[in-house]
Each structure stands twice: as structure tokens, then as C-alpha cells.
Amino acid sequence: MNSIALSIGLSALSGFGDVEFHGVGQTAVSVVDDVETLDTRLIFGAFGESEGAVYGFAFETVDDLDDVGLFQAYVGADFGGLDVTVGRFQRNFSAELATSTFGYTYGLTNSTVFDRYDAFVEGLSLGGEVGDASFAIDVIGDDVFDGDSSTVSGRVELGALGFGFIGEEFDVWTVDISDEKGFISYTDDNGDWTAVAQGVVFTIEDTFSGYGRVEYDHLDETTYAVGGKCEFRDGVAAIAEYDDRDEGVRFGLRFSF
């Protein structure tokens, strides 16, 4: 699926439409149990739209810039209000995932729910909008027409409210409310539930912001993360964060365009 979508995307880039280049890079130091680790990652892609058709592909560095792998590759079209996408794309499931950029969320770490499921999948996606309501259904697998080898996930939104699921029988489902400052969600995975609240707590002159995340789950465990983010200019930010889950302190620099 990756090679097919990539070859189609390359042909589309040379054939029609305006192309925009987007990407994100981040380098972060983590200190956990007095052990320091450095992680650096770059993602770069080209995306275009022309006469109802959309297409794009992106690559990511692997193993701290030692190698490069395919991150995203898809083609799509708008059929009178029904959007169809084929290839490797971002899954439709939660508010946290919907507001992420190339898999990066507001801070340096993601919620437990976000990290539990693949953010990018291969298959076919159908979606559309009607007023304030929108929906997207993903059929995931090498053969999307084979019910035994494919799975389904999706998301429905009505204003600030959202509902997402994974599996034909809703084995995993989430309900959330979100805005530009954060979200509150409740996710059930075969009876094991997790509640998450994340958001910006304060801002100073649109340059510095403090944020936090709290999780509470079916095991009666509460974890949290707190951080600060300083945006030097559009797309460039320094972030510091403490995550209670591993008692780790992280410092990072991120740029996006």
C-alpha cells in the first residue's frame, strides 16, 4: 500500500495543482532516573490540491537521523461532499489525535490513550461535513474489502463534541469535548477506561503558556504532566515538561512550517 500510494502521489505532484511543503522537527532531552537520552526527529512532506483532488506524502527520520522512512502517502478526492482518501493517513479517532500535527501534540508527551493506538494507518477513509457536523470512517488493512483482514475506526463531531471508535463492534470508543485550548475525554477499551483532561492553564502575552494533563483510569490511578511552552516566533518553540508517569523531566526545541 505504501509504495502504491507514494508512486501515485509523485505522479500527481508532477501532473497538476499547487504544492505546499510542510514539516516538523524536534530535538528533546529526557532525564529519567538520572539517565539522559536525546531524541531528534524530522518530518518533511509535500501536499497539494487541485480540482477536487488531494494528494501528499511525507518522510520521517528514523533512529535519530540514521535512516529515513515513509511517514505518510495518500491520494484523495471530493465526490460532492464525500471525501475519499487512499493510502497511509492519520487515523480518525480522538480529539487529541485530531488536533495533533504529524503526530506531535501540544507538549512533549502524549496521553496514555494517544500512545496506545497507531496514529497513522493504511487503508481507505471516507468522510464528509454537514453544517457543524462531520464524520470520518477508516477501513484499515492491506485489503479493505476483506472483512477478515481489515478493521474499522472512525469519528463523528458535532461542534465541540466528538465520538470515536475502533472496531466494528466498538471494542474501543471515546467521547470528548474540545476547543482550541484543550480537551476532556473518556475512553473505554474493552471495559478498561481512562479519563483525560488536558489544556492550556495560562498564557503570558501570547508568547509563554503553561499547560497540564491529568489522567484517571479504571485501576484508580491518577497521573499528571505539567509544562511550559515559549514560542519565539511562528512555528518555533521551546518546551519544558515533567511527566509523573515515569517521573521524567524533558526539555525540547520544536519547529514547524
How would you label these PLM feature ranges?
Residues 132-134, 147-221:
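Detector for outer-membrane/organellar transmembrane beta-barrel domains
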Residues 234-236:
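C-terminal beta-signal and adjacent terminal beta-strands/loops
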Residues 158, 226-232, 244-257:
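Outer-membrane beta-barrel "beta-signal"
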Residues 34-42, 67-71, 118-122, 129-131, ...:
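Residues that define the transmembrane beta-barrel architecture of outer-membrane proteins
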Residues 113-117, 212, 228:
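Short Gly/Pro-enriched turn/cap motifs at secondary-structure boundaries
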Residues 23-29, 57-61, 86-88, 137-141, ...:
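Transmembrane beta-barrel strands of outer-membrane/channel proteins
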Residues 1-17:
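Gram-negative bacterial Sec-dependent N-terminal signal peptides
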